[in-house]
Amino acid sequence: MFDISFSEILVIAAVALIVIGPERLPKVARTLGHVFGWAQRYVNDVKSDIQREIELDELKKWKASVEETGRSIENSVHTELDKFRETVEAGAEASAMPPPTTAPAGESSPPQNSSPAPAEPAPPPVQSTKNSDPAGPGVNRERETAE
């Protein structure tokens, strides 16, 4: 973390032993260890907070991008739906209008009825009872007379 070599640490320890003295040196070393540990934890906490903020920033950007894409898709769907609605309404209006007549100016045509006239049912066929064969038309009569 501080780029201090082992020989530099030995020099610092020797100076501390001379200045502080052998009785208080263990207590001071323990206190310095706690302070360095606290500083390292604080630095690590700050790093992790910064990392979380960066990730949140990236997620917010990604979320905004996804929302923008969603709005774009929604707008295009609404646009296409409106076009489709206009087409359907135009088709409904066109089918509701009567067809234009194309008769020449000199001739007059009778008004055309859009529905066909109802047809009358045809009368049932009348069968003649004279010379009619009750057995039917396909029966061989020669056999009956020969017996």
UniProtKB/Swiss-Prot annotation:
Keywords: Cell inner membrane, Cell membrane, Membrane, Protein transport, Translocation, Transmembrane, Transmembrane helix, Transport. The chain crosses the membrane at residues 1-21. This is Sec-independent protein translocase protein TatB. Part of the twin-arginine translocation (Tat) system that transports large folded proteins containing a characteristic twin-arginine motif in their signal peptide across membranes. Together with TatC, TatB is part of a receptor directly interacting with Tat signal peptides. TatB may form an oligomeric binding site that transiently accommodates folded Tat precursor proteins before their translocation. One of its GO terms (molecular function) is protein transmembrane transporter activity. Belongs to the TatB family. It is a single-pass membrane protein. The keyword Transmembrane applies. One of its GO terms (cellular component) is TAT protein transport complex. Its main location: membrane. InterPro entries: TatA/B/E, TatB. It is found in: Cell inner membrane. The Tat system comprises two distinct complexes: a TatABC complex, containing multiple copies of TatA, TatB and TatC subunits, and a separate TatA complex, containing only TatA subunits. Substrates initially bind to the TatABC complex, which probably triggers association of the separate TatA complex to form the active translocon. Residues 103-117 have a biased composition (Low complexity). GO terms for biological process: protein transport by the Tat complex. Residues 67-88 have a biased composition (Basic and acidic residues). The gene is tatB. Residues 67-147 are annotated as: Disordered. NCBIfam families: tatB (TIGR01410). It comes from Nitrosospira multiformis (strain ATCC 25196 / NCIMB 11849 / C 71).
